[in-house]
Design a protein with these regions (language model features):
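Long, aromatic- and glycine/proline-rich binding clefts that accommodate carbohydrate-like moieties
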Residues: 712-789
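Extracytoplasmic/periplasmic substrate-recognition and gating elements
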Residues: 654-731
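Conserved N-terminal structural module of periplasmic/extracytoplasmic solute-binding proteins
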Residues: 28-84, 89, 115-119, 128-133, ...
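C-terminal motif of bacterial Sec signal peptides marking the signal peptidase cleavage site
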Residues: 22-25
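Short, solvent-exposed loop/beta-turn-alpha elements that line the ligand-binding surface or hinge
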Residues: 499-512, 589-609, 665-675, 793
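Glycine-centered hinge/linker elements that transmit conformational signals in sensory
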Residues: 595-627, 651-653, 661-666
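Beta-propeller blade signature
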Residues: 83-85, 198-210, 262-265
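Hinge/lid segment of periplasmic solute-binding proteins
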Residues: 483-538, 552-556, 660-667
Length: 816
């Protein structure tokens, strides 16, 4: 058995390294940081990378010419520290971890490195955590362990009641200790969970060859201590004068106080002082002058404040304006400058003038910005960038080491850019763009994030994005976060009709894609966008309450509520504004014709929508101990909004409602009342210089795939065969004996989907037509302003509908 939140995967690790050198156009698209890099580079990927790069790497850092990293052995029992010299292309082990197991596999001794730092003479400092099972515990006989002992131990470990401990054992733990014949190994559980540990934390300094220079015990603990405090190390750092800084956090176990400080040691391991800090510090940064500064957030920005090691104090004045990217580290770049990571790029920041200069955008050199975890300057002036991320397609971590050499602009090959704008870059999209770039010589997908750091709300950010991107004629493609953005752009004629490409594609046809998703992406008969996946939003209720056929009207919903005792709620937590927006999304195309810039709000249908919204409170005030799942089970809440992207939700809701479900949908005059939610919505702009190349990039998201791991992506496939395969896989036996899912007081054991469940979901999905998020914020604001007069009782619903009709028509005419 396993929990929903835990997905067990056998993870292996590998490094995909392209061989040889390549040149990529540099210049970067416009963004919130609109500066264009004035530096140009060639990029190469070393051939002879160490075998350890194929394992699980941890805590990778570039210091000078070396990559220092931790890597596990083949059976993942020992983690050691290695050094790879980039210039010489040599590898060596600096420190070997230890681990000892009993015959049954129980670990009784382990050592690992929490943090490391490198000095100017290439000495390496390690913060080592050594833990051992106590001698008394090793000699303890567990053979007589009983079920009651196990439950008591669970209660002790997690402070649970007896009933909760029994539930924990039955649902999450027992399967691991139960043999096929039903025999339960209680003794093995007690060995695993009843062990008492003693630990030692120590500082270890080794030279560049791995020889120990000194070893110093920092603290020791044992299970018999009645300690009032817990102490953790948060990182170690070196300055340019041989001093070592150890960040510590000490907090009381009763939660009443915290203490943050930095212990300082000289090059021989002698303690030289302690620096008290005001609060949590994100990390330490070595400055170009060799001093160390603390990095922390002050308000909205990251601030650097230098440490004075002579007085053991921190400067009150700091360098401001960083965006938090210094948590990825920094490297000295000349006498006064730091190399820092900002918004998908590398920049240099002058510590005296505070001026910045962008050196490069990662995407310009096919380096995945979202996966960069270390960078540095080599002794010959080249820039090294190490990246690593989990690949959903390869089901393992993939690592890369890129070496960038500065060249003259005249040496750059001529490359046509396809500029893609988005609010936030998805790592999977980034990976696909990089793969596309490597295969298409002469063209380069360049993705720029447009997110306004000064925006106070999501709506503000949407407006900022829409304004900036709509005005930028250099943008070829847009990745929309919100369907209302698509409506806004398409209504202004800014999007290209994708049907002209789809209908001429030799491998992809309209019949390959979900027909209702295509319809949802149409405006005036033109395919203005395509999502990479979709989900369904609808309403569920007990079949005994709402019947068995999806779809109903406002009057039928009101009648259901009227038939129930006073105080019964239709939905838990829904407000008037939310209810009204749902109605508008459902009937958007009947209310607004974007192609002709006309609207139809002075209708009985919209009046009914206003009356429906008025059934809900202006603000929802729930009780502190209220559980919506219990209220639904007891019939005090009749309906629930249902977000469908897999089949487990069905079984959970059936358990909560304790009845057969009907996907009744939101009240509407047509359709099944379900809405399609589009994810990662792509469009090609009218200004696109190379629309055929843009389509070549876009189409790869919709080609057939044999990848069994597609099910790990959010939502349903836009391809019909992908959706059908998803349904087919949902009926297969579950791995690991299945899993359970809990909601409030309810817990259900998830089983393979039944034929009945599959049929119901297919009917729901294929017949959903409305699109969630169709209403723009500007339109919603006009409606809310006028609807308030009806909700307050000042005007009738009909009068408000007429006023909305008048204002909306003016707005549509002005913004056409």
């Amino acid at each position: 058995m396993r929990k929903k939140e835990i997905l067990k995967k056998g993870i292996s690790f590998a490094l995909v390294a392209a061989m040889g050198a390549s040149l990529c156009a540099c210049g970067g698209g416009k963004s919130s940081d609109s500066s264009e890099p004035k530096h140009f580079y060639s990029v190469e990927y070393p051939k002879n990378l160490p075998a350890a790069f194929s394992n699980d790497l941890g805590n990778v850092k570039i210091f000078g010419d070396n990559v220092i990293y931790q890597s596990y052995n083949e059976d993942y029992t020992v983690c050691s520290v290695y050094q790879y010299n980039i210039v010489e292309q040599t590898e060596k082990m600096l420190w070997e971890g230890t681990s000892e197991q009993l015959e049954d596999g129980t670990t009784i001794k382990n050592s690992s490195v929490s943090y490391f730092a490198v000095d100017d003479d290439n000495s390496i400092y390690l913060y080592v955590y050594q833990s051992n099972v106590t001698e008394e515990c090793l000699n303890r006989d567990y053979s007589a362990t009983t079920y009651d002992d196990v439950i008591e131990r669970i209660m002790e470990m997690w402070g649970e009641t007896e009933d909760a401990a029994i539930q924990e054992w039955n649902n999450w733990i027992s399967g691991e200790y139960t043999a096929e014949d039903g025999t339960v190994d209680y003794a093995k559980f007690m060995k695993d969970y009843g062990l008492e540990w003693e630990s030692t934390e120590r500082l270890l300094k080794v030279d560049e060859n791995g020889n120990t220079v000194y070893e110093k015990v920092v603290r020791e603990t044992n299970p018999n201590e009645e300690g009032q405090w817990t102490i953790n190390c948060n990182g170690i750092y070196c300055d340019g004068n041989g001093n070592l800084y150890v960040m510590m956090n000490k907090w009381s176990n009763d939660g009443t106080s915290d203490e943050y400080y930095v212990d300082v040691y000289d090059s021989d391991g002698n303690s030289t002082g302690k620096i008290e800090l005001d609060g949590y510090v994100s990390n330490l940064i070595r400055m170009p002058n060799g001093n160390v500064a603390i990095g922390d957030f002050s308000g909205d920005h990251y601030v650097l404040r230098e440490i004075d090691v002579n007085t053991m104090t921190v400067s009150e004045e700091g360098i401001e304006g960083f965006d938090g990217s210094l948590e990825s580290g920094a490297a000295a770049y000349g006498e006064d400058e730091l190399l820092i990571r900002e918004n998908g790029s590398l920049s240099i920041c002058n510590m005296k003038t505070h001026e910045r200069e962008k050196l490069l955008n990662f995407m310009d050199y096919n380096i995945p910005a979202s996966s960069v975890n270390s960078f540095g300057i080599l002794s010959d002036g080249r820039i090294a960038v190490f990246s690593g991320s989990y690949s959903n397609t390869q089901m393992k971590y993939v690592y890369d080491l890129a070496i960038l050499t500065e060249i003259d602009e005249s040496e750059m090959p001529k490359t046509e850019r396809i500029n893609v704008a988005c609010m936030w870059l998805d790592s999977n999209v980034e990976s696909m763009a990089i793969e596309f770039n490597k295969k298409h010589e002469g063209y380069h997908i360049s993705i720029t994030e447009y997110n306004d750091p000064d925006a106070e709300t999501y709506d503000d950010m949407l407006r900022s994005f829409t304004t900036a991107v709509a005005a930028d004629k250099s943008i070829d493609m847009v990745i929309f976060n919100d369907y209302s953005q698509v409506v806004n752009f398409a209504s202004k004629g800014l999007m290209t009709d994708l049907y002209q490409f789809l209908d001429n594609d030799t491998e992809l046809t309209r019949d390959d894609l979900m027909p209702n998703v295509l319809t949802a992406c149409e405006m005036d008969g033109k395919l203005v966008c395509l999502p990479t996946s979709f989900s369904i939003q609808t309403v569920v209720g007990k079949a005994s309450d709402v019947g068995t056929t999806p779809g109903w009207t406002f009057d039928e919903m009101k009648a259901l509520l009227d038939s129930k005792p006073q105080g019964t709620q239709l939905f838990y937590g829904m407000t008037r504004s939310q209810a009204l927006q749902l109605c508008l999304n459902l009937g958007y195309k009947s209310y607004i014709d974007s192609a002709t810039a006309t609207c139809h709000f002075d209708t009985p249908e919209f009046v009914a929508a206003l009356e429906f919204a008025n059934m809900f409170p202006e603000e929802f005030e729930g009780q502190e101990d209220e559980d919506s799942s219990v209220l639904m089970n007891e019939g005090k809440v009749l309906l629930s909004e249902f977000y469908l992207n897999d089949f487990a939700e069905i079984q959970m809701y059936e358990a909560v409602f304790n009845d057969k479900l009907t996907y009744i949908g939101y009240p509407t005059t047509e359709g099944n009342g379900a809405m399609i939610s589009l994810n990662n919505i792509y469009g090609i702009t009218k200004n696109c210089k190379h629309p055929d190349i843009a389509w070549e990039f876009l189409r790869q998201f919709y080609l057939p795939t044999d990848n069994e791991n597609d099910e790990y992506s959010y939502g349903f496939s836009v391809r019909k065969d992908g959706f059908e395969k998803f349904c087919e896989n949902a009926q297969k036996p579950l791995e690991d004996g299945g899993w359970t899912w809990g909601w409030g007081n309810f817990e259900v054991e998830i089983h393979p989907a039944t034929d009945e469940e599959i049929a119901a979901i297919k009917d729901l999905v294929y017949n959903a037509t409305a699109v969630n998020g169709a209403v723009t914020n500007e339109i919603m604001n006009i409606i809310n302003e006028e609807a308030a007069y009806y909700f307050s009782g000042e005007q009738s619903a009909e009068a408000v509908a007429d006023k909305i009709q008048s204002r909306m028509q003016i707005y549509l005419s002005e913004t056409k």
